[in-house]
Amino acid sequence: MKKEIENREDLYLLVSKFYVKLLKDDNIKHFFDDMVKENTLEDHLQILVDFWDNILFYTGAYRRNAMRPHLLLNQTKPLQKEHFKIWLNHFNNTLDENFTGQLVHAAKTRAQSIAMVMELKVNQL
């Protein structure tokens, strides 16, 4: 049964199910190979929970530069327009499959903006 996004536990559910999709997608999973090999995926998921906690609940939990790791990744594994579309599609589908309510719309809107900005930034290099 779908529920509203209410807390960090819900955000963990969101990002963990989202990453299951990403890691199964042959078009995008190679971006996460190092995290899987180095066994740092769980750490990454916790960072994402902080990020979305800050975005949706304004907690101040995320204090990092979200662009920096993506710019570094782009140097070795170039991020293309299609990758951002795939990322966004999986994110939106994960939201729709598991949650309902106003924060679903807010998360989708912010994810769209984030994808657009990241795509612009990586293509500037």
Residue ranges of model-derived segments:
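Core of compact, soluble alpha-helical bundle domains
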Residues: 1-125
